[in-house]
Amino acid sequence: MLQRTLAKSISVTGVGLHSGERVALTLHPAPENSGISFRRTDLDGEMGEQIKLTPYLINDTRLSSTIVTDKGVRVGTIEHIMSALSAYGIDNALIELNAPEIPIMDGSSLPFIYLLQDAGVVDQKAQKRFLKILKPVEVKEAGKWVRFTPYDGFKVTLTIEFDYPVFNRSSPTFEIDFAGKSYIDEIARARTFGFMHEVEMMRAHNLGLGGNLNNAIVIDDTDVLNPEGLRYPDEFVRHKILDAIGDLYIVGHPLIGAFEGYKSGHAINNALLRAVLADETAYKWVEFSNSEDLPPAFHDLNLKKCG
């Protein structure tokens, strides 16, 4: 299977979830073997240089997965666009923005899926590299854990736990095996969510200024405040899977393995990536020159070529 990039550049504007400011975002094609890179067009000189994404640049995970370079350049809330890039198997792209934060759009990855569909996706000449998990790797923190296990495909299982009545109306656990399920149908529409008391607290600290009922599910003590309700009965846990897929794709390559998590979040997801990469016996790089040898979870990528 070959690497892929966008067929053409495409732009969109939106609002930063935390800054509340307008953000102009452009996705560009990029050369093979260049990976996913970001560039802040509002910064000059070295601060405005291209940043090649790696797990080691995620140095702020308090509210999202945020790039912080050694020069202090920030690119925040990258997990939703990374999740969409993962769904389309984009290996190489340059993402330019004129603000410190990717726009939140509607709180899901669906607007970014539409962007990729509009831009088109094309194969390149170099072989796509997959990161294959060879043995279990687990990271535990207080009251939460995540792990990779070997699996001939890509499967994600997550469990959430919140002490609010609204979360008791659906299962706290969701599992998706991409050998038989579609990311676009099952995951892409799930929106980020937050609690009313947290919204008030964040705004008091000049955070969450761009959040509203059009780009997040807002929950009070007992119910969902969005008049249209939920897009999936278990939208909360599905969004956590959307986030996890984006967090894991920060490694820059599709993963062959099973990911499980209990109360996972951006920090522990990133810690798991780093733990895998730190142990050379835990993984290997693989290529598939014959697409018939691809694990079934990645067959759908062959249907997503256009341009």
Model region roles, listed by residue range:
Residues 1-91, 96-307:
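C-terminal regulatory domains involved in ligand/effector binding and gene-expression control
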